């Protein structure tokens, strides 16, 4: 299994890290077969596979359910699972209880927490032996406040983002995800930090990149962000379903090629 130390070595050797956001067994199995370095089980599963309006409705049980499936599909890949909104920032006791449950039940390598306001949680979870990945910049759980826009785009905001990145590392974060940040700022933060920095919409100067499986394969997604490159196309699923519907209605499926041919009625008459 790929360990955290392998990811640190990759940063040290300037070898780019690949991360894919996956939510289920089949996609995780494909990611591992493709030798993707890390898998993120993001709370974006709420919109992508559960049909919610936002990540706000995603529960801890949702994350555990999907995290387990991903681990079964990718037993040898470094897996990070999101702590959904409402599971941290409550109290020290409850925060750690939720983090430990997610970490243990999914058999993840780390949990992810959004925002610099969770410094205390990162410190305490790390002390308990729970590796924490931090997420700064555009944080989906706060998008209702921030809006879907680039972060760190003013002098003051850039300084704050640098300070926050250094603070989460100091608190014990083992990795940082930077989302929707100016490329030069993301590169500077990656250079300053010792921990791996994974970018999404943050340019090529970070230590690695993350894209959502469904986005990069055009699988059920109506809109893609500017920073998403499409590497495949699963959008013809509707056409396939329409063809299936047509063939069944017209009696063309199943044909002989898809039918067990043993004749049993004669045996029943004996």
UniProtKB/Swiss-Prot annotation:
Pfam families: Pantoate_transf. Keywords: Cytoplasm, Magnesium, Metal-binding, Pantothenate biosynthesis, Transferase. Binds 1 Mg(2+) ion per subunit. The keyword Metal-binding applies. Its EC number is 2.1.2.11. Its cofactor is Mg(2+). 3-methyl-2-oxobutanoate binds at residues 43-44, 82, 112. It is found in: Cytoplasm. Pathway: Cofactor biosynthesis; (R)-pantothenate biosynthesis; (R)-pantoate from 3-methyl-2-oxobutanoate: step 1/2. The keyword Protein biosynthesis does not apply. Mg(2+) binds at residues 43, 82, 114. One of its GO terms (cellular component) is cytoplasm. Disulfide bonds: none annotated. It comes from the Bacteria. Coiled coil: none annotated. GO terms for molecular function: 3-methyl-2-oxobutanoate hydroxymethyltransferase activity; magnesium ion binding. GO terms for biological process: pantothenate biosynthetic process. The active site is at 179 (proton acceptor). Belongs to the PanB family. Catalyzes the reversible reaction in which hydroxymethyl group from 5,10-methylenetetrahydrofolate is transferred onto alpha-ketoisovalerate to form ketopantoate. Homodecamer; pentamer of dimers. NCBIfam families: panB (TIGR00222), PRK00311.1 (NF001452). This is 3-methyl-2-oxobutanoate hydroxymethyltransferase. It comes from Staphylococcus carnosus (strain TM300). The lineage of its organism: Bacteria, Bacillati, Bacillota, Bacilli, Bacillales. The gene is panB.
């Amino acid at each position: 299994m790929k360990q955290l130390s392998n990811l640190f070595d990759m940063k040290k050797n300037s070898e780019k890290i690949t991360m894919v956001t996956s939510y289920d067994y089949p996609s995780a199995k494909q990611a591992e077969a493709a030798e993707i370095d890390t898998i993120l089980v993001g709370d974006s599963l709420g919109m992508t596979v559960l049909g919610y309006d936002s990540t706000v409705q995603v529960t801890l049980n949702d994350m555990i359910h999907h995290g387990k499936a991903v681990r079964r599909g990718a037993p040898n890949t470094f897996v990070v699972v999101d702590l959904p909104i409402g599971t941290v920032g409550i109290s020290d006791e409850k925060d750690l209880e939720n983090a430990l449950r997610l970490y243990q039940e999914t058999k993840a390598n780390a949990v992810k927490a959004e925002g610099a306001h969770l410094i205390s949680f990162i410190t305490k979870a790390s002390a308990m032996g729970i590796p924490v990945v931090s997420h700064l910049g555009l944080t989906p759980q706060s998008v209702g406040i921030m809006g879907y826009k680039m972060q760190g785009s003013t002098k003051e905001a850039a300084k704050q983002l640098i300070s926050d990145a250094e603070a989460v590392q100091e608190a014990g974060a083992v990795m940082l995800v930077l989302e929707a940040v100016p490329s030069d700022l993301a590169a500077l933060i990656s250079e300053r930090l010792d921990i791996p920095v994974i970018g999404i919409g943050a340019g090529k100067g970070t230590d690695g990149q993350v894209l959502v499986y469904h986005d990069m394969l055009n699988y059920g997604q109506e809109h893609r962000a500017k920073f998403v490159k499409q590497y495949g196309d699963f959008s013809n699923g509707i056409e396939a379903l329409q063809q299936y519907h047509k063939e069944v209605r017209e009696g063309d499926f199943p044909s002989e090629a898809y039918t067990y041919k043993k004749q049993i009625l004669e045996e029943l008459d004996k």
